[in-house]
C-alpha cells in the first residue's frame, strides 16, 4: 500500500506512484502474506483457499488445481486438500495459509506473527518452511515478539515506538 509518510521503492518503482491496479497486481504476484489468524475462508476447502489468489491473478483454470495441490503437498498437507479449516489443527491451517501465500511464487513473503497461535511443534514446522524459503532465495519478512522464532532470522530489525532502534545480523540473546 501507499506509505502515509516517507517513501519506498519496490522493483525500482516508487510505490506511492503506482495506480490502484498496479498495487493490486503487486500484492497478488510479488508479495505473499501470512497472518497470525490464518485468514482462511471457512466455507472453502484447503484446496480452494489456495486456489483463490490464482483466480485473482488470472491463472488459467486448468493450471490452478495442479499448482494448488503441489503447493499443499510441499507444506505436508497433500492428504488434507479436501478438508475445511474447522477440520484442521492450527498448524495445518497456518500451512494452508503459507501455501496460499506462495502459490503465485512471490519474491517476498511477509509474515505477521505467523506462529502466535501455534504450539511449539507447529511453530518449528512453520519456521522450517520459512527457513527453506529463505534458502531458495525468497525474501522473508517476519514480525514476531518471540525470541526463539526471531532466532531463525539472519537479520533483525527491532522497532521501538515506531522507529528502528536496532538493525543487526546474528542471534538475539
How should these model regions be labeled?
Residues 171-173:
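ABC ATPase nucleotide-binding domains
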Residues 1-159:
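ABC family nucleotide-binding domain
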Residues 156-168:
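H-loop (His-switch) and adjacent beta-strand-loop-beta switch element
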Amino acid at each position: 500500500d501507499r506509505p502515509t509518510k516517507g517513501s519506498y521503492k519496490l522493483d525500482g518503482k516508487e510505490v506511492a506512484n503506482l495506480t490502484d491496479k498496479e498495487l493490486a497486481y503487486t500484492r497478488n504476484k510479488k508479495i505473499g502474506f501470512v497472518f497470525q489468524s490464518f485468514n482462511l475462508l471457512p466455507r472453502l476447502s484447503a484446496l480452494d483457499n489456495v486456489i483463490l489468489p490464482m483466480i485473482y491473478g488470472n491463472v488459467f483454470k486448468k493450471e490452478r488445481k495442479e499448482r494448488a495441490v503441489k503447493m499443499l503437498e510441499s507444506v505436508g498437507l497433500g492428504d488434507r486438500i479436501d478438508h475445511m479449516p474447522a477440520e484442521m489443527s492450527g498448524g495445518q491451517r497456518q500451512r494452508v495459509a503459507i501455501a496460499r501465500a506462495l502459490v503465485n511464487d512471490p519474491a517476498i513473503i511477509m509474515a505477521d506473527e505467523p506462529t502466535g497461535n501455534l504450539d511449539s511443534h507447529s511453530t518449528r514446522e512453520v519456521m522450517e518452511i520459512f527457513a527453506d524459503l529463505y534458502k531458495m532465495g525468497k525474501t522473508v519478512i517476519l514480525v514476531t515478539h518471540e525470541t526463539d522464532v526471531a532466532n531463525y532470522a539472519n537479520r533483525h530489525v527491532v522497532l521501538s515506538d515506531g522507529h528502528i532502534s536496532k538493525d543487526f545480523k546474528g542471534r538475539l540473546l
